[in-house]
Structures are given as structure tokens and as C-alpha cells.
């Protein structure tokens, strides 16, 4: 019985840790298009690890598919940072 309770407790802790690690991740970034030069600031959900390097790789690929070049990732953040960036991102808020 004790072994069963210990196994259940371990499984519960592992599932809690996994769900905490699966929290949404977002990045704000700057991108450009050439001919004519167009610049934009945007906010996008990041797939994968919540790091600037992972965001850079993910966003560069997604933006390039639409003819944009990623200039830089400004920051990565969780959902608590979305609202304060929404107006600045305008039509590029969660577009890519």
C-alpha cells in the first residue's frame, strides 16, 4: 500500500511539472521586407522552448514563408505580457 501511494505521488508530481513546463510562450520581434522597404513589430506565439534562441529559429522560418526577414527577437514572455504589447503590435499581434 505504501509503495502504491508513493508511486501515485510521484506520478502526480511528474504530471504537474510537465503541465507547468507547457505554459504558453510568446515573443515580440522586429521584421522587414525589401523592395519597397517595410518594417513591422509583432507578437507571436513561440513553438518549442521558451528562449530567445528558439523564438528566433521558429519565427525566422515562419516569417520567411510570408516574405519577411526577422531582424531580432526583442523578448520572450508568458501570457501576462500579451495585453501591454497588443496595441503596439497592431495587425501583427499573433499574426505569425
Residue map of PLM features:
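Terminus-proximal functional modules
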Residues: 2-96
Amino acid at each position: 500500500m505504501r509503495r502504491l501511494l508513493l508511486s501515485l505521488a510521484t506520478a502526480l508530481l511528474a504530471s504537474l511539472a510537465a503541465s507547468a513546463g507547457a505554459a504558453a510562450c510568446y515573443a515580440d520581434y522586429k521584421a522587414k521586407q525589401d523592395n519597397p522597404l517595410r518594417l513591422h513589430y509583432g507578437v507571436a506565439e513561440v513553438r518549442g522552448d521558451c528562449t530567445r534562441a528558439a523564438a528566433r529559429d521558429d519565427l525566422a522560418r515562419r516569417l520567411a514563408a510570408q516574405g519577411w526577414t526577422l531582424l531580432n527577437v526583442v523578448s520572450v514572455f508568458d501570457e501576462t505580457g500579451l495585453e501591454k504589447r497588443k496595441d503596439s503590435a497592431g495587425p501583427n499581434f499573433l499574426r505569425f
